[in-house]
Amino acid sequence: NLRKKTELIEQMSAADITFISDSTTLAKGITATLKAKVDADLKNNKYTLSENLLSVNAVKARLNGWVQLAGDDINTDITLDCSGNNFKDILSLVPAFYTKDFANLTASGDVSLTAWVRGRMTKTAYPAFALDLKVANGSFKYADLPKSVTDIALRASVRNAGGSLDATTVEIPRFGASFGGQTFSATASVATPMSDLAFKASANGKINLGAIKEIYPLDKDMSLNGIITADVSAAGRMSQIEKQ
């Protein structure tokens, strides 16, 4: 007979993970590992995370909380402690940065990343979840390129009160950066992503495409030219675009 309580030691890893939704690649090339000690209450099917470390590319997080099996459902209350990560770690989550040139990238800035999942998952409903990311005074530079990107600021959040994934909202009330004497800022928000995506976005600034090669390592056969000047805003639903 199994003891009512025991300790489990888990170690899992996966490489080159790709996330695809409706034929759209959301992320690729992700490497993830999890090392964890789990206190298992076998009588109540409750598993509490104790010592653990989750790594996703260069980002490291500690998981606090528990998971409980309830028939076909799963109850959960988990928070992610992401303290200790720096701006370069966060950039590793962006496929365009997490390449062979990542080792040549230096970055600095103030970063805050928090996330949690709480509630019951069933065959038809999801628990509530949230993620908040803040970046201030950010900058990055590749060692073999002449210029850097500075004054990076970002506030972003993902929210869902539980139930349907269609209740998920994404808010980016602030994004800004400067490079080559130019500044660019933008905002965005997304709602009802599963049924009829509703969006609102704005952008302001000037981007010299010819200067991109001075801040980012382009492929040898890629050449960018031209100047983009933006002072625009847009709002609508995906169904409206599909009708055009």
Language-model regions, residue ranges each:
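Membrane-proximal interfacial segments on either side of biological membranes
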Residues: N1-T48, V59-E171, Q182-Q244
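Short beta-strand segments that buttress and anchor functional surface loops
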Residues: S50-V56, P173-F179
